[in-house]
Amino acid sequence: MDADKITEKLGITMSQMQRAAAAAIIQGSGNVEVLSPTGSGKTLAYLLPLAQLIDAKSDELQAVVIVPGRELAIQSAEVLASLKAGVRGYACHGGRSAMDEHRELRKLMPHVVFATPGRLNDHLDKANIDPSGVRWTVIDEFDKCLQMGFADEMNHAMERMPKTARRIFLSATNMADDGRANGELSPVGFHIVDFLENSDDHKDRVKINIVNSPDKDKLRTLANLLACLGDESTIVFLNYRDSVERTADFLRSEGFSLTAYHGGLDQSQREEAIYRFANGSANILISTNLGSRGLDIPNVRNIVHYHLPETEEDYTHRVGRTARWDKTGKTYFILSEGETLPDYVDATTCDFEFPENLPKPAKSRMTTLYIGKGKKDKVSKGDILGFLCKTGGLKGAEIGRIDVYDYYAYAAVDNRKLNFVLKNVQGCKIKGKRTKVEEMR
């Protein structure tokens, strides 16, 4: 399907960078490197042209996308599915059985595989993935992949791809002079789509606020700030896992709607945390820097630096979570006595002033329902939407994101209607099958 038709159907307006990248991939015949700031939409920049170029009638694997983490693999597969172009995608990553993935790969026969380096090599070693028909090999977040030490694994995987396959690297940093970008990872001779100089445009769309804390322990100042931000979607960044848990526990005790995210959680816990934040069931995400890369969550209004970022790169990727796709956003530095703004924050700042009467913590706009039937039960998004409207008594505007998995589904509903809808659907059937419906805990 033509990329322009896909965007028109979905109501998407491609940015200048995305158009330039798409043109280089569709019209060119060589390798392409896309350099563009965090939050500028690089995932769509390569998926839209691939959706046009891939032969959806074939059952061959035609593209392999290497990503640095499981969250980006999952999200990228979801983005491809949302394009509704008939192109099948599948995410392969650690944290689950490779044997289960092999069964799914054989059944689905994806056109595109999104994979972390280690899991990709595992499947290649076991011949679970046949790369012979691959026409495109993509490395998304190329800079982060190198920084995380995946160079050897990526080189090994790339060596096993057909020599005729075109290569597409996407990065928020120019890694041409990085010694790790060698061998199969060298971008020498690539057509460069460089929009890094436009990063100042993103800075102009982010307002920087200084929040002074009278205490070294900033928890009370943070709580007061979040109360002022109301139900706006906000990410609070800290540098340590223990600090995330401590902060989350305190804010929950204060009545805030939040979820916590860090590398110490297992895969299902991390996925649930991001899901609740993305669908509006939690206003606040408390996160380590793990949440500053690989997460594409629209409409994040505020970034709060509870701990100062340790490097300029950390700062860039934190702030890149807001003001995405030409939107505006705000970032807040909470500074205790003796702390100063890092030198690399060179924009104009404002001092945040608290009102005399602080508002109470805002409730979340949405709540997530767990529905105990899924794809294996022949239940679709449309079935769930109809069930919640006809049986649950909800209006369409009171229902948010719906996601259907193999054996269950999630649906976001207006928080004010939670008890109403649960009462209406208890004991009722969906597509003739009695099912459990309850609030996600």
Show where each model-derived region lies.
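Post-DEXD/H (motif II) to motif III coupling segment of the RecA-like Helicase ATP-binding lobe
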Residues: 129-199, 344-346
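Conserved pre-motif I regulatory segment
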Residues: 1-35
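A short beta-strand element within the Helicase C-terminal
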Residues: 133, 284, 293-308, 330-334
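Conserved segment of the helicase C-terminal RecA-like domain
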Residues: 284, 311-353
